[in-house]
Amino acid sequence: MTGIFNQDGEGTLVEEGIKATEEGNTRLALNLFSQVKPAEMSPLVTSYQAYCIATEQKNFRKAMDQAIDALQADRSHPLIYLNLGRVFLAAGYRKKAMQTFRKGIRCQRHPLLLRKLESLSNRRAMPFPFLQRSNPLNIIVGKLFSKVF
């Protein structure tokens, strides 16, 4: 994350805001992001602010618009996908959130994206739990079960 901060200490509000967001203190983060000068707002910071708006103010339309704008400005940063997905989740759009997380993983396999997608996935139990998931027997029987049930 050090690439988005100025070396002369001007990025401290941004650093503290991102840290507060990741620790779950979105109210403090939103307050910190509102103090950041518009010229210092990168797409990443804008996406974090959008997530804070969604969780604290419940203004989902504004948060989605802001996060989508951030993604359009920088499609290469996986944390922007993470924050857009979080906004979709907060708004109740689970399917859109999972699609966004998957797009972010295609961009870069970031651990936070992987963890979030894994926590949302809804895989069924394996037919033969004593075998590995990749075992052909589990795969074939699993596919048969999915067509029957």
For the regions a language model picked out, list residue spans one by one.
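TPR/TPR-like (Sel1-like) alpha-helical repeat modules
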Residues: L89-A125, N138-I139
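Long, contiguous interaction/recruitment modules in multidomain scaffold/adaptor proteins
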Residues: M1-T12, G24, G142-F149
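TPR-adjacent "capping" and linker segments in tetratricopeptide-repeat scaffold/adaptor proteins
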Residues: M1-T12, Q35-E40, P127, Q132
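Canonical tetratricopeptide repeat
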Residues: Y48-A50, N83, K116-L117
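Alpha-helical repeat scaffolds
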Residues: R61-L71, M98-R102, F130-I140
